[in-house]
Amino acid sequence: MASDKPLRLLLGFDYGTRQIGVAVGQAVTGQARELCVLKAQNGVPDWNRVEALIKEWQPDAIVVGLPLNMDGSPSEMSERAEKFGRRLNGRFNLPVFTHDERLTTYAAKGERLAQGQRDGYRERPVDALAAALLLEGWLAEHPD
């Protein structure tokens, strides 16, 4: 989905059926940071929480991670993530882009291991960090 408005601030979503990681990123720095993890019921978030994040951060666009298979083909979750993106666009009238999120959760767990976390992903989930990594990937591919 194209946008004529400069994309300065973006929110990234790492979509999941039980949890959705959220990150914020800036185009000027190309960096993103984790914000929060939203609980989801069968992939449906608390839309009031999503709306509160949109109002607080006022992003120019949204990036949703697209969970592709390792060969690049769509996964079972790909359609659900795309549907989530369409709902974000419909509810908030913001441009929504998808970005290949292969291995972001793996990379996020690797970062947490490097920080000393050995387990406890329920207590300290990696979803928001995965969202930050996928958002940084999108920003790197769209530098302007």
From Swiss-Prot:
Coiled coil: none
Location of the protein in the cell: Cytoplasm
Enzyme class: hydrolase
Gene3D superfamilies xrefs: YqgF/RNase H-like domain
UniProtKB keywords: Cytoplasm, Hydrolase, Nuclease, Ribosome biogenesis
EC code: 3.1.-.-
Species classification: Bacteria, Pseudomonadati, Pseudomonadota, Gammaproteobacteria, Pseudomonadales
Recorded GO MF terms: nuclease activity
Pfam families per UniProt: RuvX
Name this protein carries in UniProt: Putative pre-16S rRNA nuclease
Cross-referenced SUPFAM superfamilies: Ribonuclease H-like
A GO cellular component annotation in the UniProt record: cytoplasm
